[in-house]
Amino acid sequence: MERFLYLMRHSQSADKQPGQSDKERELTVQGIRDSIKIGSWLHTQKINPDLILTSTATRAKATSGLLLDTLKQMPEKIQLNDELYDASVRTFLREITQLEDTLNHVLCVGHNPAISYLAEYLTKAEIGDLPPGGLVIIQFEILLWQKIGEGSGTFVKLITPETV
């Protein structure tokens, strides 16, 4: 069965302000525009994630919300996961392999370096660091999400706000 995983780095965020935690950093105006751009591209490609799994950082939640608004999807499609804020590849893998197998298109919004490392681990492609708002599309030929692992995915495309 064909499944798709969309790995996205949150869009451009503001620098940390005095007294503000890193987790509370918000999107810049450019980050908001870029999230809408990527959401519009997904919409024109008729890509509608069954689920958006996102970090609980303000900038990741905002990116996910803007994608959802642009795709005209229901907010219950967002699943917040605090462990994705400072995640390792292992953490992402654990969360993805526990997904319901009724989901065929899953979008994860996270942070570098883990989101970039995960894309390279799953595809064995040299992708490099995802820029803010960057999105990697990975295709799997699997019946169960628990079957994903090193090199099990096929790199389909890298999308950035500058390329759409």
Predicted feature locations:
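Short, well-ordered alpha-helical microsegments
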Residues: 60-61, 89, 115-116
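Hydrophobic packing residues within well-ordered alpha-helices of enzyme cores
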Residues: 63-67, 92, 118-119
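Non-DNA-binding regulatory cores of transcription-related proteins
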Residues: 99-107, 112-134
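Active-site-proximal alpha-helix that buttresses catalytic centers in soluble enzyme cores
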Residues: 3-83, 127-130
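Domain-level recognition of soluble alpha/beta enzyme cores
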Residues: 126-156
